[in-house]
Amino acid sequence: MARMQESADLLKCSFCGKSQKQVKKLIAGGAVYICDECIELCNEIIEEELGQAQGQEEEHGELPKPSEISAFLDKYVVGQDQAKRILSVAVYNHYKRLRAHEQIGGRRRRDEEDTELIKSNILLLGPTGSGKTYLAQTLAKLLDVPFAIADATSLTEAGYVGEDVENILLKLLQAADFDVERAQRGIIYIDEVDKISRKSENPSITRDVSGEGVQQALLKILEGTVAAIPPQGGRKHPNQDFIQLDTTNILFIVAGAFSGLEKIIGERRGKKGLGFGVEVASKKDEEKEDIFKDVRPEDLVKFGLIPEFIGRLPVVATVANLDQESLVKVLTEPRNSLVKQYKRLFEMDDTLLTFTDDALEAIADLALERKTGARGLRAILEEILVPIMYDIPDRDDVTEVVITGEVARGEAEPELITHTAEEKTA
């Protein structure tokens, strides 16, 4: 009887049920008791959860301000100040929206004052070789998010020969090493979107599988949908498991040269003259990018984009054509400029590479003649330097290679400065 009374009087932990004899310490709080072991376990759980939250915060890092984003772009991209400002603000607002969404645990608050922040994708207008792709790549580098590039001309509507729209998302998943959460915060750059304009302004009766059909297929992923992604590509492996990817928080940057759009804008602005062969623009030398700055949705519709597609791209930025001066800056000024890269390659062979000012201007002129912009600069440098890069590893006597304007234009051979020449000069 005494033993039963002792058992009844024995205090127990309200959480694990252990008696006060089985634990080191039992703390009372009203009619509830907690032992030292449960306290230690609670502390471990709290520390783990706080550590995960802190790790997530460190992973995302502090969101750079628009001015900081623009300053970072300045280190790698020459000119395009207006485009940099627009992109910086758009990217800042996009990831600020993501942070706000994460702070409420991915759920919309039921507060009447809460405002849902809608995603703003970006449309980039500008000529080939003006730095559109590089701007997007540099943004992804700064933000440390997965980045994928897709060519709109390779896409077709589902069921036809070509790439499905879902293949774009597969590229982003691959860039994120199939980390779905990371991919869902990434950036997708779709180039040559002007090439998927529909054939006429009016809706087509016949199927336009590589034009309007692709625009229709892109609508859902641009706005936000949960897409089923085949990890090995869809059409060749129909029985594979699918990965669910939510595109709601993916930033899409859609770009194109939109050749001919300036005429449509010019006509709307009342610059269409009367008579045969009249120039569309009032000034013959008016820059295309200046006209592009006045682009309106109705101009893009007339060009061949469907209204629903334009509506998913509320932010419009234009990039300028690069002149000779800008191309010379592209060659020399960015942190990882082409000239710096080739100089480093020559340094590895203990050789100094020097470009004269007229050489840089000649290289820029060649890019302008070929109408390749900054994109064609590397190919021109390769043409000039490959023969000498072939010989230099076998020439221990060469200390410096000088590239002049004549060399760049193919009128002369590079000047080689050797140990012997230096000794004679000394």
Curated annotation (Swiss-Prot):
Disulfide bonds: none
Cellular compartments per GO CC: HslUV protease complex
Domain annotation ClpX-type ZB: ranges: 1-54
Binding residues annotated for ATP, in chain numbering: P127, T128, G129, S130, G131, K132, T133, Y134
UniProt keyword Zinc, yes or no: yes
Gene3D superfamilies: 1.10.8.60, ClpX chaperone, C4-type zinc finger domain, P-loop containing nucleotide triphosphate hydrolases
Entry keyword Metal-binding: yes
Keywords in alphabetical order: ATP-binding, Chaperone, Metal-binding, Nucleotide-binding, Zinc
Molecular function per GO: ATP binding; ATP hydrolysis activity; ATP-dependent protein folding chaperone; protein dimerization activity; unfolded protein binding; zinc ion binding
Coiled-coil residue windows: none
One of the GO biological process terms: proteolysis involved in protein catabolic process
Binding residue positions for Zn(2+): C13, C16, C35, C38
Quaternary structure and interacting proteins, as annotated: Component of the ClpX-ClpP complex. Forms a hexameric ring that, in the presence of ATP, binds to fourteen ClpP subunits assembled into a disk-like structure with a central cavity, resembling the structure of eukaryotic proteasomes.
Family the UniProt entry places it in: Belongs to the ClpX chaperone family.
Purpose: ATP-dependent specificity component of the Clp protease. It directs the protease to specific substrates. Can perform chaperone functions in the absence of ClpP.
Name of the protein this chain belongs to: ATP-dependent Clp protease ATP-binding subunit ClpX
Species of origin: Corynebacterium efficiens (strain DSM 44549 / YS-314 / AJ 12310 / JCM 11189 / NBRC 100395)
Taxonomic placement: Bacteria, Bacillati, Actinomycetota, Actinomycetes, Mycobacteriales
Encoding gene (name): clpX
